[in-house]
Amino acid sequence: LEVFTDIDIPKEYFEDILKRQAVVNAGVTFTFRNEEDGKFTKTDYCYPNGILDYVNEIAGEQTLTMPQFWQAERKGRDREDKPEYKVRISAALCFSNRVSRLEYYHNSSWLEHGGAPEKAVKNAFVYAIDAYCKQAGKYTKGESKLTFQDVADCLVLVTNCFSTQTSYENQTKKAITNKFVQDAMTEFFRDRLHVYFIENKQEADRIADQVLVNKRSRESAEKARLNIKKKLTGSLDIANRVQKFVDCRTKDVSKREIYIVEGDSALGSVKLSRDAEFQGIMPVRGKILNCLKADY
């Protein structure tokens, strides 16, 4: 207590830890008892089907595809001089246009920063969905390849892996770096997605269509952002002046004048008769509203 003077840990921290442990340890009940104002409250966390129940909870009922549960075991090594070990891979996933979530667990620990499983998922999902879009003719002519962000925006995925050898990125243990785990998971997801798309063509079409909607909306938003940024930060020149505005030559603001005229026809007449040294002109569209006949 002399060193750690603040021991008031919020209950939400314990609730989050216990819930995550219940997710990755199917059928095991974790109980949280908390005393407040002399009274105990009790909360149980249990997912009989583990990560599959968790994905159902996150995605809800309105999903693009039915939740899937895939699992496999692989055996290999990270390098030739390293010992061989086993890895058990489990994954639950579905696609949704309402919610997205990606969570990776290894040996019952939440990998907040992902590492090898995250890299495997990115590689496999982009490869499989891009291949399906090309095969099904989903891309327009000359369209760029989709990115993982386009996939992630409609993907609910939870992976839960166990291995007898684990290499963590650092002491925080929030990411793993096992090359074999990454390669095994990449192959696992590529194969499962390939088979899934063949056996479930309607769902594959819905997935591809939603991913392409995400991609095209992202590209449109990025294009609009860059155009606005260019207009706001670019220097004033002939290319980005206000349309139809006729400027004057002097930079002395005390002498500059602006004439607002009605329509392009008036613009032509005033432009011929003005003093271009200090008089600018801005035409506006005329007769937009007849105020005498307006109903307000």
Predicted segments, located by residue:
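GHKL-family ATPase ATP-binding module
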Residues: L1-Y296
